[in-house]
């Protein structure tokens, strides 16, 4: 849908961009674009970011970009190339790269709020290593065997030695990831949910996501609204009065629930769910079995009950 709108020259005609420009002018406020900077095509695409910048060309001097380096869906040391590509594009078309951080922190989906906090502090408070050149910092990270996924927070300085951006309550944020699962946590603390126990609270009310991240979100507005799918397998099973079970560990939980149900977060009637916590390790190569044993124990127990006519499991 997004790519088609670009190809048919309809992307920049979206009313949401008109609203964002109008809001920015009315409030004399900035626009912050946040998301994964790569062309991996799993969570985001750099071409979408470019189109957003072009769509906001009327206020291009107000655009600041907060990039998450990838390293998982693309080469682990390709982030420097994407950053240089973006900086060249911005020089010609407007916008300015303001902060950089690895997706390990900004795109957690397993309730590791201490990771999200790093991204939150970077975007909201400019808390990170100060630099005048992102490429030099990333080269140094590579030299220290720290690849794109794990890039520590970086903040661009202006000619006066101050961070080039300062997020204010009247600003706008656009999260340009199109896949929802790794965008929810950061979105929630920036505009939806108070996480004071982790030092985070909502600070932006004018918040947009490229697609719908969570139907429970009240403030985050999707630019491309979800198409509600009918007669998914889970719905058909439910309509036939068959009990069904969804089971996975937290890292894979959205795949057997939200995604499997065609974008519906709420369980169908007679659908039950079991969530096993994923291990609390820095990276899963330290515990490659993850929570397979716990998932197995749970599923054996449920199978022996002979209650469910359908089981969806993800190790």
PLM-predicted stretches and their roles:
Residues 1-315:
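Feature captures the catalytic ectodomains and active-site-proximal regions of enzymes
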